[in-house]
Amino acid sequence: MANPKEKTAMCLVNELARFNRVQPQYKLLNERGPAHSKMFSVQLSLGEQTWESEGSSIKKAQQAVANKALTESTLPKPVQKPPKSNVNNNPGSITPTVELNGLAMKRGEPAIYRPLDPKPFPNYRANYNFRGMYNQRYHCPVPKIFYVQLTVGNNEFFGEGKTRQAARHNAAMKALQALQNEPIPERSPQNGESGKDVDDDKDANKSEISLVFEIALKRNMPVSFEVIKESGPPHMKSFVTRVSVGEFSAEGEGNSKKLSKKRAATTVLQELKKLPPLPVVEKPKLFFKKRPKTIVKAGPEYGQGMNPISRLAQIQQAKKEKEPDYVLLSERGMPRRREFVMQVKVGNEVATGTGPNKKIAKKNAAEAMLLQLGYKASTNLQDQLEKTGENKGWSGPKPGFPEPTNNTPKGILHLSPDVYQEMEASRHKVISGTTLGYLSPKDMNQPSSSFFSISPTSNSSATIARELLMNGTSSTAEAIGLKGSSPTPPCSPVQPSKQLEYLARIQGFQAALSALKQFSEQGLDPIDGAMNIEKGSLEKQAKHLREKADNNQAPPGSIAQDCKKSNSAV
């Protein structure tokens, strides 16, 4: 029902039955359906007439059959009484005085009620001795009437009633009828009072303690609250609180600390308001430096060295156009050798790119689109730095990335410039006037005047080779060379590679060189490895040296030929 005060169909059926002096009777005829959705059939008997109806509940079925009976019943219906109308009754049970107060607040005019004395009656005394019809001994008192004067702004209204409250309601009702249709007057604040009114409105919502702290903060004055006295029985305590604000102080008393603190703040607040107002200080305006907008260049030379995908996107943003649209067209090739084809679309322009993965294909497609739009190709930033020589980020050693492999043949040992210079100096100092030649087995046991002649010990040549490789000079070779007395024609400088080849040939270092390479590949120390090999197989080296010397015995003119070959090589 929309209105709870409206009568239901069953209530109206009961009124109809009372009016016709019959008894309504409801009967539950049937109940069917599952437990969660049952249907009930109800029968209503009113006099000689019966009606049936169904509903999801017994109550709903009764209401439905009652509605059916009201529409189809032939019994005479009672006349509906009109609702009582009372002028003083307002909708929503709001009294006229309350409604008038709200209207008066909107208008900014207070409503003031003043009671008035009733008019005095004439001084008339009846004849109490005559007991006639019109002169009874005991007279009924005249009913008293109350009068009220209501003032709303410049308007005055009078009300009367049996009680003082009824008189007030009567006056408020007359004021409402007169003021409801009048426009609300506009109140313009007077000069000099508007600011005070605004401040008063703001301060009205703040407590006295908050106002004290605000004033003290503006004037840089310290604030302190202290309970100085506490007296009275436990159920009726009395507290005295002292507040100090700079040079001002006040005390407040109350039955709680909060109340005493509030009263003390109220007292000191009155003294603080007497202080002269603070001078108005204009704050300097803050000037914020505007940041320049990020300039996105869209020239043909912009972005060289950037990623083509980012470069193409920035160019489109600078043009305020739609960003590039990338689509994967196809994927072809063997499982381990895939090839992706990516398409990029910028406006009406379309370009494609291929690559072993989607990222490279997308990059190539963006590069092709840049070339198609008339921009220069993107070059690597590292290549640009190498060309221009600009590497301002780091001047120290480069990070330990793997160095690119060179095309040097295997088995060739590179000597540093320092080692090479020492070897050249020692060679000029010691070898000048000596001859180079291959040693025969006959000369193994004889001291030779040549530079690489071997001492009677079997491992002297190995010692010379090791010293030359490690230090660049050989003290053993110098000692042997000093013993030689036969002068020989000077030989032109020999290349270090030839020297190393000669040492390896006479010592049989082919296996040792490969072992050094294996040691370097395994991360071991090649010198220690070579020394271990030499210490473990000295006898084998001596035997191998004799065989090499027999096979490679050179004629006397071989030294000159070697010198010529070395000169031509240099």
Swiss-Prot record:
Modified residues (Phosphothreonine): T405
Region annotated Required for dendritic transport, chain positions: 381-570
DRBM domain boundaries: 8-75, 95-181, 207-274, 307-375
A cellular component annotation (GO) from this entry: neuronal cell body
CDD domains: DSRM_STAU2_rpt2, DSRM_STAU2_rpt3, DSRM_STAU2_rpt4
Subcellular localization(s) per the UniProt record: Cytoplasm; Nucleus; Nucleus, Nucleolus; Endoplasmic reticulum
Known function: RNA-binding protein required for the microtubule-dependent transport of neuronal RNA from the cell body to the dendrite. As protein synthesis occurs within the dendrite, the localization of specific mRNAs to dendrites may be a prerequisite for neurite outgrowth and plasticity at sites distant from the cell body.
Protein name stated in the entry: Double-stranded RNA-binding protein Staufen homolog 2
Provenance organism: Homo sapiens (Human)
Species classification: Eukaryota, Metazoa, Chordata, Craniata, Vertebrata
